[in-house]
């Protein structure tokens, strides 16, 4: 059905009734927009949905995802991941007990035991729920939220019910914006 996608595996079965492939051992899905590597994967041809268990890695243009159980819609590039799930967006790592992800809207959310690590700004934010908006470089963290900023040889801790991490892009004012 999709000539751009190639699936490889050491073992595979096709279930005609469900339009479903079940692959085991060294599963690889290659597509110009993403790459998936898994130990065990079910692929539904009509919906292009994948369900996987065991160590799985999904690589897109600007993200890497790792989990040990989850679902990924290859057509819409969105998914739900559990068990040791992580999303790596450039210099930011999102970890949590469960993660949702949508590449088209550049949005991710994390639930339970979440950790957002920003290696560029040397910041770690923890909590029990987070929403991450990659396109505007911001995040909202609630429920037991704490931010840790590493400053030279020290750390700054900030605790709140809800934390917002927002990157504001600075543009210099034009001469006509000057107030006299």
Specify the residue positions occupied by each region the protein language model found.
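Structural signature for solvent-exposed beta-strand/loop edge elements and short helix-capping sites
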Residues: 1-172
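Single conserved hydrophobic/aromatic residue that forms the stacking wall/gate
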Residues: 170-173, 177-180
